[in-house]
């Protein structure tokens, strides 16, 4: 079972991890929320370092860059490929072909710039408020969302791809375990506060369903790039609604 954790850490981070990979890569999906907690914890350390210097803007930059470096920019690369393929391809075949191109096009560049700016703004607000649990929660929920997509949507490429080994055996057990783990970690990180936890969960679900709907419409399934893009967009959605919560825009339901 721990071999799944090894595979999840090696897949989602640059951390050097001893041990053997899982025989079935899909078993690593059980551990995605836990690895999200590890990544989120490190991102929080970067944010705290910046705040320790009395510089919220630096805290947001350190958290942003720390997250990208820790994950090799893997998910950001997936988002760029998705943007190029989905908005630059006229049909399913063209979209899949463009997504496989290692070069980043105009749509991908715009997506990356937009993501970095949006993340920086949200992280700045969260760091200023000392809402470190919300920062970590965004990372946990984004990795949980990847499991839900992998478990419920087919792989789009008939010839397979880099994420095939993770998706082909994924099913309800992975979805249920990851969902429960992700929600429990969310509530722990937010000190069992029901309203803010529910708001963050709602934001993640909206982003998840949007990515799933768009991917089904454009290519009829998912790829590794879609899973990466899902992580980025869910993370942003969670941090955004968290920032709105801190600004009192959900006070009517508190």
UniProtKB/Swiss-Prot annotation:
Q: What is its main location?
A: membrane
Membrane-spanning ranges: 27-47, 50-70, 104-124, 131-151, 170-190, 194-214, 233-253
Pathway the protein contributes to: Cofactor biosynthesis; adenosylcobalamin biosynthesis; adenosylcobalamin from cob(II)yrinate a,c-diamide: step 7/7
Give EC number(s), comma-separated: 2.7.8.26
Record-level Gene Ontology MF annotations: adenosylcobinamide-GDP ribazoletransferase activity; cobalamin 5'-phosphate synthase activity
> A Pfam family in this protein?
CobS
Q: How does it sit in the membrane?
A: Multi-pass membrane protein
Top enzyme class = transferase
UniProt key word Cell wall biogenesis/degradation: no
The keyword Electron transport is annotated on this UniProt entry: no
Q: Which GO terms describe its cellular component?
A: plasma membrane
Q: Which cofactor does it need?
A: Mg(2+)
Name the InterPro entries for this protein: CobS (IPR003805)
Which keywords has UniProt assigned to this entry? Cell inner membrane, Cell membrane, Cobalamin biosynthesis, Magnesium, Membrane, Transferase, Transmembrane, Transmembrane helix
- Reaction equations catalysed: alpha-ribazole + adenosylcob(III)inamide-GDP = adenosylcob(III)alamin + GMP + H(+); alpha-ribazole 5'-phosphate + adenosylcob(III)inamide-GDP = adenosylcob(III)alamin 5'-phosphate + GMP + H(+)
The Gene Ontology biological process terms listed for this entry are: cobalamin biosynthetic process
Q: Give the domain of life.
A: Bacteria
Please state where this protein is localized. Cell inner membrane
UniProt record similarity statement: Belongs to the CobS family.
Q: What does the protein in this record do?
A: Joins adenosylcobinamide-GDP and alpha-ribazole to generate adenosylcobalamin (Ado-cobalamin). Also synthesizes adenosylcobalamin 5'-phosphate from adenosylcobinamide-GDP and alpha-ribazole 5'-phosphate.
Mind telling me which HAMAP family this protein's record contains? CobS
Q: Which protein are we looking at? A: Adenosylcobinamide-GDP ribazoletransferase
Species: Chlorobaculum parvum (strain DSM 263 / NCIMB 8327)
């Amino acid at each position: 079972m721990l071999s799944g954790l090894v595979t999840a850490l090696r897949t989602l981070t640059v951390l050097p991890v001893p041990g053997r990979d899982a025989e079935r890569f899909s078993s690593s999906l059980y551990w995605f929320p836990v690895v999200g907690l590890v990544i989120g914890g490190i991102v929080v350390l970067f944010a705290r370092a910046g705040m320790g210097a009395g510089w919220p803007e630096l805290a947001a930059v350190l958290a942003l860059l720390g997250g990208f470096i820790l994950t090799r920019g893997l998910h950001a690369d997936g988002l760029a490929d998705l943007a190029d393929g989905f908005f630059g391809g006229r049909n399913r075949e063209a979209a899949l072909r463009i997504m496989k191109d290692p070069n980043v096009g105009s749509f991908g560049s715009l997506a990356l710039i937009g993501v970095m700016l949006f993340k920086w703004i949200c992280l700045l607000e969260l760091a200023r408020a000392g809402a470190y649990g919300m920062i970590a929660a965004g990372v946990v929920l984004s990795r949980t969302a990847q499991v839900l997509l992998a478990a419920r949507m087919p792989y789009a490429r008939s010839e397979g791809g880099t994420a095939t080994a993770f998706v082909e055996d994924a099913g309800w057990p992975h979805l249920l375990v990851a969902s429960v783990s992700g929600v429990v970690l969310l509530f722990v990180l937010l000190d069992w506060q029901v309203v803010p936890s529910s708001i963050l969960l709602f934001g993640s679900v909206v982003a998840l369903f949007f990515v799933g709907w768009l991917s089904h419409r454009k290519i009829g399934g998912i790829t590794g790039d879609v899973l990466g893009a899902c992580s980025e967009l869910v993370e942003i959605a969670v941090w955004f609604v968290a920032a709105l919560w801190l600004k009192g825009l959900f006070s009517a339901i508190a």
